[in-house]
C-alpha cells in the first residue's frame, strides 16, 4: 500500500514537473532602488550603516552580477581587514531575495558578504537562460571566493560560505574541494540531484528513467532552437490563481510555501522558479552526499524542525565524517521556506551563524 506521505510527495512532484515556462506574471519590477524584496532591505547607502555595492566580474568567461554588502564601519582608507562570507541563493531564486537578506544580516555583524546571481540566471550572463547545471552553481561559489580574494580589505584567511536551499547543497559541494572556504554553513539545504533523480521525499524513484528520457528529448529540441523549461510556478498566473493553487496543498510544505514566497510575497522578475528541462541530464548525476567526507572545515547545517526537506539535511550531515567540528541546528517550529523570511526564524538562524562564524573565521 502506498503511504499518504508518498502519495502527497508524488502529487508535489507532478506539480513541480507540470509547469513548463520561463516566468510567472509579476505586477512590476521591485520598487527598491537595488531591486531588493526582503523586509528591512537597504534603500540607500549611508555613512555609518551597512552599504550595498552592485558589482560585476567573470567566471569562466561569463558575466556574474552580484551585490557586495559592506559593514557599517567599512573604510577603505583604514588598515582594518574583514572576514567575508559568500551567500548562494536557492534554486529558482535571485540575489535580491533570501540570499540578500542573509548577506545584509551578516554585514550587520561585521562581515563583508556577497550574494550573486547564478550564471545563466538573474542578471548574470550565460545562454540558454535558466540552465541549471550543478557544476556551474558550484563554480559560482568558488567564483565568489575568487572575487572576495581580490579585495584588499578582505582577510583571505577568513572566508566562509553560506548556502540556502539548493545553494546550500552546492555550497557543501564547493567546500568539499575548495579549501579557501574556512567555515561552511547551509540553511534549509536541498539536495537538487537527489530530488530530480528520486522525486521529492524519494517518492518517485521509478520515474527517474522517464525524466532522463524527457531531458534527452529536450536536448534534441535545443539543437533545433527550442528551449524547454520546467518549474513549480504556474506560468502567467494571477495572484488569485496562485492562491487557489496554494489551497490545493498542505500548509507548511515546500511547494505551497514556495508558491507563496516566489509568486506572491517576495516575487522578483528574475526569480522564475524555472530551469531548462535539459538540465536534468546533469542534475540527476549529482548528489551532494557522495563526497561529504571531504569536508574537513567546521560545518553548520541549519534547518526548520518542521521542514519536509529536513531528511536531506540529516542525511548529508550524517555523512560529514571528515570534520571534527560539525553541528546540526534545528529551528523549532520552522518549515523550509519560513526560514527565508519569518523574523523569529531568521533571527534564530542569524544568531547561530553569528556564533559559528565568530568562532571559526
Question: What kind of region is each of these model predictions?
Answer:
Residues 30-80:
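N-terminal cap/lid segment of alpha/beta-hydrolase-fold proteins
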Residues 92-104, 118, 313:
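The serine-hydrolase catalytic nucleophile loop
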Residues 105-125:
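Conserved alpha/beta-hydrolase
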Residues 131-152:
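Alpha/beta-hydrolase active-site loop
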Residues 295, 301-303:
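Short beta-strand/loop motif that positions the catalytic acidic residue
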Residues 334-346:
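Catalytic histidine-centered segment of alpha/beta-hydrolase-like enzymes
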Amino acid at each position: 500500500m502506498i503511504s499518504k506521505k508518498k502519495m502527497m510527495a508524488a502529487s508535489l512532484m507532478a506539480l513541480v514537473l507540470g509547469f513548463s515556462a520561463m516566468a510567472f506574471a509579476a505586477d512590476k519590477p521591485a520598487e527598491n532602488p537595488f531591486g531588493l524584496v526582503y523586509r528591512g532591505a537597504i534603500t540607500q547607502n549611508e555613512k555609518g550603516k551597512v552599504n550595498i555595492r552592485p558589482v560585476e566580474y567573470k567566471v569562466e568567461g561569463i558575466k556574474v552580477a552580484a551585490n557586495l554588502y559592506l559593514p557599517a564601519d567599512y573604510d577603505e582608507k583604514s588598515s582594518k581587514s574583514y572576514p567575508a562570507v559568500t551567500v548562494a541563493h536557492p534554486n529558482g531564486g535571485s540575489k535580491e531575495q533570501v540570499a540578500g537578506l542573509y548577506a545584509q544580516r551578516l554585514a550587520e555583524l561585521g562581515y563583508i558578504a556577497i550574494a550573486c546571481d547564478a550564471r545563466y540566471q538573474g542578471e548574470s550572463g550565460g545562454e540558454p537562460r535558466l540552465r541549471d547545471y550543478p557544476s556551474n552553481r558550484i563554480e559560482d561559489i568558488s567564483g565568489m571566493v575568487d572575487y572576495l580574494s581580490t579585495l584588499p580589505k578582505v582577510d583571505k584567511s577568513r572566508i566562509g560560505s553560506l548556502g540556502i536551499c539548493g545553494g546550500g547543497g552546492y555550497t557543501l559541494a564547493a567546500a568539499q574541494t575548495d579549501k579557501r572556504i574556512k567555515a561552511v554553513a547551509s540553511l534549509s539545504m536541498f539536495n537538487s540531484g537527489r530530488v530530480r533523480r528520486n522525486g521529492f521525499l524519494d517518492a518517485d524513484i521509478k520515474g527517474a528513467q522517464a525524466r532522463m528520457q524527457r531531458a534527452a528529448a529536450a536536448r534534441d529540441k535545443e539543437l533545433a532552437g527550442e528551449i524547454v523549461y520546467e518549474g513549480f510556478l504556474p506560468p502567467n498566473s494571477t495572484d488569485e490563481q496562485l492562491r487557489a493553487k496554494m489551497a490545493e496543498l498542505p500548509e507548511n510544505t515546500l511547494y505551497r510555501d514556495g508558491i507563496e514566497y516566489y509568486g506572491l510575497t517576495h516575487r522578483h522578475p528574475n526569480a522564475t522558479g524555472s530551469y531548462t528541462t535539459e538540465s536534468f541530464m546533469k542534475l540527476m548525476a549529482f548528489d551532494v552526499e557522495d563526497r561529504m567526507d571531504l569536508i574537513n572545515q567546521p560545518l553548520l547545517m541549519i534547518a526548520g524542525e518542521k521542514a519536509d526537506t529536513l531528511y536531506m539535511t540529516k542525511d548529508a550531515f550524517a555523512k560529514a565524517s571528515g570534520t571534527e567540528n560539525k553541528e546540526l541546528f534545528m529551528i523549532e517550529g520552522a518549515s523550509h521556506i519560513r526560514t527565508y523570511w519569518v523574523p523569529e526564524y531568521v533571527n534564530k538562524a542569524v544568531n547561530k551563524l553569528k556564533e559559528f562564524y565568530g568562532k571559526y573565521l
